């Protein structure tokens, strides 16, 4: 949508380069074959969109009969990229260049950039990469800098791209835009994103989950994002989402696909320890999508999670 924060970059960068910008009609995001045809008809060369759009196209086999032949580059942002669906897309369009981006609105768009070149297993998360120019991205555990591989920390951002704060909301501003604990300069601020990440073996940042999606279950600290990655990699599952029901202390797996629950549980047992296995499964014909093109977790929580 043109009011989405990433649209600022899309609009002005496109026009500044002398390119032509096309806005995809919203109805096409529920009609994958129409969407692919639109890309061909308009001779689209570069796309910047959320992974949900890619998932919809590959899940409904919209590339089987028609491929966007003019496409040269695809950039993803706004959601975790399901690796299985990305591999299916890249297999159909191997000549296209791909990039995975990350960046909250509070940091004026993209903070990290990752050029996807190597191969990934379906269960392996695609990194968000390294910090963009004029931006520093760090992982903090409290006020301590995280540098070790596979150690979880909160993704924090500093640099000239930071916003001044939230309009007419000083309380929220003071919570998120805080003094840099690694610098003596009292006035230097960083933005705590509320997102959790880690470094992989290549030194790349891997997004894990929202901080508020980290739960304590059966005495173990669990990242729901890890369960979602394993769920989305199961054959027959097009998209998956995991929520936690605090009232009953149950992990709820909501998914789009035809896989039977028994087969799904057996597949997850091969990838996850018992304490991370979902306690309840909710199959859907199609995941709800919000106005920004992402999975509507708020709606799913309202419909399928029992609160107080």
Residue ranges and their predicted role:
Residues 5, 24, 49-50, 60, ...:
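Short hydrophobic "strand-cap" motifs at the C-terminus of beta-strands
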Residues 5-45:
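Conserved AMP-binding/adenylation subdomain of ANL enzymes
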Residues 11, 16-19, 44-48, 58-127, ...:
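Gly/Ser/Thr-rich phosphate-binding loop
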Residues 33-36, 65, 228-229:
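Short hydrophobic/charged patches on amphipathic alpha-helices used for structural packing
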Residues 52-54, 81, 162:
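Alpha-helix capping/helix-boundary segments
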Residues 56-59, 84-88, 109, 165-166, ...:
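Phosphate- and divalent-cation-binding pockets in alpha/beta enzyme and binding domains
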Residues 97-100, 115-308:
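AMP-dependent adenylate-forming
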């Amino acid at each position: 949508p043109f009011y989405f924060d990433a649209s600022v970059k899309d609009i002005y960068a496109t026009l500044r380069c002398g390119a032509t910008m096309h806005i995809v009609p919203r109805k096409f995001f529920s009609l994958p074959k129409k969407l692919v045809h639109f890309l061909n008809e308009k001779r689209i060369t570069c796309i910047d969109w959320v992974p949900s759009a890619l998932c919809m196209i590959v899940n409904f086999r919209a590339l089987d009969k028609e491929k966007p032949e003019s496409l040269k580059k695809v950039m993803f942002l706004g959601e975790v990229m399901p690796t299985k669906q990305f591999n299916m897309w890249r297999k159909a369009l191997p000549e296209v260049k791909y990039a995975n981006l990350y960046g909250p609105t509070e940091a004026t768009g993209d903070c990290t950039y990752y050029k996807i070149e190597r191969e990934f297993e379906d269960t392996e998360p695609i990194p968000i990469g390294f910090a963009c120019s004029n931006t520093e991205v760090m992982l903090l555990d409290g006020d301590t800098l995280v540098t070790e591989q596979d150690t979880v920390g909160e993704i924090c951002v500093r640099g000239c791209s930071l916003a001044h704060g939230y309009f007419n909301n000083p309380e929220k501003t003071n919570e998120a835009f805080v003094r840099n604990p690694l610098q003596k300069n009292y006035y230097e601020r960083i933005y705590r994103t509320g997102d959790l990440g880690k470094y992989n073996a290549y030194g790349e940042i891997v997004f894990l989950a929202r901080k508020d999606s980290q739960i304590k279950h059966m005495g173990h600290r669990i990242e729901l994002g890890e369960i979602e990655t394993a769920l989305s990699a199961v054959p027959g599952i097009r998209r998956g989402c995991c929520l936690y029901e605090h009232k009953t202390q149950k992990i709820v797996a909501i998914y789009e696909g035809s896989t039977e629950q028994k087969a799904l549980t057996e597949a997850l047992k091969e990838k996850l320890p018992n304490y991370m296995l979902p306690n309840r499964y909710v199959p859907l014909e199609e995941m709800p999508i919000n106005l920004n093109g992402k999975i509507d977790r708020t709606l799913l929580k309202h419909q399928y999670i029992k609160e107080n």
